[in-house]
């Protein structure tokens, strides 16, 4: 019995070791989350068409299927009686998912080693954030809170506050660049003051300006 128990404890380490070998070949990543007494397995096959993730929360399974060849994989989380939908556009570089479980945080993205959490009793998943480097997650921003299922797992899903536009800044439609009242940069981009002899004189820095003869 003790031998079987030790073998069971070695399974997560074998998964991590297999991940390290799989990353060198670019084949697959395996992440295992343990919630209470039930395992939560996430398996993503890099070379195939679709990675499949299965989350066991309480008594209900949560299945995530993403087709890599398309533009947007859709993940549906069924928690309690309400579904929580997460849509991520895969045209960016790295979609990032952050799982905060209790006090520890588990972050998974393409290229990161797999991790294993073991918890006693019920595990509380605080946040699930999915974002992309180049594309927004969804047009709707906010927090969706659902009632915990019978297993005692509470899930709060929060989407990233995406700032689109050039250089990641949120930009408004204010016409051309040089007409932006707060923009700084380059010739004719600054808000020029009418000072100097070409603009009929005037004051500059509190001193009277005189024309040169």
Curated annotation (Swiss-Prot):
CC terms in the record's Gene Ontology section: extracellular region
Compartments where located: Secreted
Domain of life: Eukaryota
Sequence segments annotated as region (Disordered): 162-213
Signal peptide: 1-26
Keywords assigned: Repeat, Secreted, Signal
Ranges of compositional bias, category Basic residues: 166-213
Keyword Manganese: no
Ranges: Sequence repeats: 27-48, 49-70, 71-92, 93-104
Region (4 X 22 AA approximate tandem repeats) location: 27-104
Descriptive protein name: Skin granule protein
Record organism: Xenopus laevis
